[in-house]
């Protein structure tokens, strides 16, 4: 079975830096809005283990440097399935520009987490998916919840 997800970009309507965490990241207060500008993410399972990622843009990484790949790895490391962990095939059709502040990578990661939750019948809550997503990128929880 294959699931195709649309992964919408987001914009920051406001962004206020309120401090800095001990790890160097900024504390922020922001208002975000999802927009109708999407990547397309196809996810399917196969018997053989491992993650295979392809991306329509050959300049983008198709390995553990990619947030879609890291999301799948984080999901598989967290999920408690009765059967052996499946292999995962992911294809990302990129439309959202990279490094444009539109959360394209985070949107792709959120789509992968949501699709894997459905495909594996893991029955994780949105909160649980957000916890996994937070380990992949700061904007992933917003992209899960919209």
PLM features per residue range, with description:
Residues 1-100, 118, 122:
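ATP-binding N-lobe of GHMP and related small-molecule kinases
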Residues 9, 144-145:
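A cytosolic small-molecule/anion-sensing beta-strand core signal
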Residues 28, 72, 113, 129-130:
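Generic structural marker for isolated residues within well-ordered, non-membrane alpha-helices
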Residues 68, 100-126, 142-144:
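DPxDG-like acidic metal-binding loop motif
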Residues 134, 145-146:
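Acidic/histidine-rich catalytic neighborhood of metal-dependent amide-processing enzymes
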